């Protein structure tokens, strides 16, 4: 068993490169990763093989774990650790969270035996046409409840894990297997969530008296592989969209609704002894790191929007207004200037400076003039008193002269 692994310092360095390229997104597309990968000077055909190996989930993009795988392969090729790109991904390079995908891909090469296809001659009495691929929200919620109760750790469903559900339905075993084959074109031992929902949807309609469809639409079949499924009725093909109403009563209308009996007695499901092996990146890059990247990106976007808004505002302010409308910007400017002037006058009045100081000086001068006037009046009164005293003295002198 190989002792090779991606070291901690490598993962941290790869994270710095990944974060600088991803712009806050969890994945890199081909064009984003090309600038770094092509710096290795490897041939394009080598880089294509590296990309195919690293893209474990086959979605055409590299998340951080897959990016680490690609970078390590590139460095090993550049440093001579590898002479050629390996045909399969070494076990020590398989991300722990995606090891089930690698094992499933390898297992597909064995092509397990598929259930025998049962040809439907459409001669079953009481069955109706009008199957619809559109899932009503209530039905979809019930399908997801069944799926969540029975999925394994890889998020997949095995045929036999739903046997109690089959037993509770009024659906022949041959029709159950036909529905399974329809959503499992690769004849895998398990199917993913989207295929499971479609499988349960087919069983629901068969339980309600509708014939099982012969084929799956090409877009829907592709969605089983891409893990994406379109549940919007507006996107359905006309032949599927305008079928009979799923709520139409059928000869089996008095039966319990699809899955109700099964769900009512369902215990804990989805148990599995599966233990993934491979490189574990979960202890290195935490959610906080992603949050920092997202916040930096949001900050840059806000700064860009702010600059754009400021430029637009300046452009509107500088643009002449010839349409005869009121320039509210000019009105606001004049009002602010008037307010500033009044505030300055009030401040000068309180501090005794400026024009208010001149007014205070005039008032003080008036008070001084008034005080001088009062002093003049006092002096005049004092002079009159002295004159009376002088006159009295002169009279006394005259009387004294006469008496001699």
Curated annotation (Swiss-Prot):
Ca(2+) binds at residues 55, 57, 59, 61, 66. Belongs to the END3 family. This is Actin cytoskeleton-regulatory complex protein end3. The keyword Calcium applies. Keywords: Actin-binding, Calcium, Cell membrane, Coiled coil, Cytoplasm, Cytoskeleton, Endocytosis, Endosome, Membrane, Metal-binding, Repeat. The lineage of its organism: Eukaryota, Fungi, Dikarya, Ascomycota, Pezizomycotina. It is a peripheral membrane protein. InterPro entries: EF-hand-dom_pair, EF_Hand_1_Ca_BS, EF_hand_dom, EH_dom, End3. Residues 314-324 have a biased composition (Basic and acidic residues). GO terms for cellular component: actin cortical patch; endosome membrane; plasma membrane. Residues 304-328 are annotated as: Disordered. Residues 42-77 form the EF-hand domain. Pfam families: EH, End3. Component of the PAN1 actin cytoskeleton-regulatory complex required for the internalization of endosomes during actin-coupled endocytosis. The complex links the site of endocytosis to the cell membrane-associated actin cytoskeleton. Mediates uptake of external molecules and vacuolar degradation of plasma membrane proteins. Plays a role in the proper organization of the cell membrane-associated actin cytoskeleton and promotes its destabilization. The gene is end3. Residues 10-100, 139-227 form the EH domain. It is found in: Cell membrane; Endosome membrane; Cytoplasm, Cytoskeleton, Actin patch. It comes from the Eukaryota. Residues 280-401 form a coiled coil. SUPFAM superfamilies: EF-hand.
């Amino acid at each position: 068993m190989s002792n090779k692994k991606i070291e901690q310092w490598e993962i941290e360095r790869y994270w710095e490169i990944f974060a600088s390229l991803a712009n806050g997104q969890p994945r890199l597309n081909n064009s984003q990763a090309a600038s770094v990968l092509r710096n290795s000077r490897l041939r394009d055909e080598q880089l294509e093989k590296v990309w195919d190996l690293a893209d474990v989930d086959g979605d055409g993009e590299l998340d951080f774990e897959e990016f680490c795988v690609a970078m390590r392969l590139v460095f090993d090729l550049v440093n001579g650790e590898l002479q050629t790109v390996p045909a399969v991904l070494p076990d020590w390079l398989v991300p722990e969270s995606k090891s089930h995908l690698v094992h499933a891909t390898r297992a597909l090469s064995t092509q397990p035996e598929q259930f025998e296809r049962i040809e439907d001659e459409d001669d079953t009495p009481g069955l109706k046409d009008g199957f619809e691929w559109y899932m009503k929200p209530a039905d979809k919620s019930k399908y997801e409840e069944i799926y969540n109760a029975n999925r394994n750790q890889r998020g997949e469903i095995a045929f036999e894990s739903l046997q109690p559900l089959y037993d509770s339905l009024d659906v022949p075993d041959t029709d159950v297997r036909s529905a399974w084959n329809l959503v499992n074109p690769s004849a895998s031992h398990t199917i993913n969530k989207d295929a499971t929902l479609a499988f349960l949807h087919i069983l629901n309609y068969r339980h309600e008296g509708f014939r099982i469809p012969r084929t799956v639409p090409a877009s829907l079949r592709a969605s089983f592989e891409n893990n994406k499924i379109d549940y919007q009725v507006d996107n359905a093909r006309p032949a599927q969209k305008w079928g009979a109403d799923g709520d139409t009563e059928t000869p089996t209308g008095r039966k319990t609704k699809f899955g109700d009996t099964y769900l009512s007695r369902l215990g804990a499901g989805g148990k599995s002894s599966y233990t993934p092996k491979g490189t574990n990146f979960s202890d290195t890059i935490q959610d906080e790191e992603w949050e920092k990247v997202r916040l930096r990106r949001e900050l840059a976007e806000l700064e860009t929007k702010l600059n754009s808004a400021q430029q637009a505002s300046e452009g509107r302010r500088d643009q002449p207004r010839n349409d005869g409308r009121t320039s509210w910007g000019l009105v606001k400017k004049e009002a602010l200037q008037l307010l500033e002037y009044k505030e300055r006058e009030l401040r000068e009045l309180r501090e005794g400076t400026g024009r208010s100081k001149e007014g205070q000086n005039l008032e003080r001068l008036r008070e001084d003039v008034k005080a001088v006037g009062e002093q003049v009046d006092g002096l005049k009164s004092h002079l009159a008193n002295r004159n009376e005293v002088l006159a009295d003295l002169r009279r006394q002198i005259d009387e004294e002269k006469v008496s001699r």
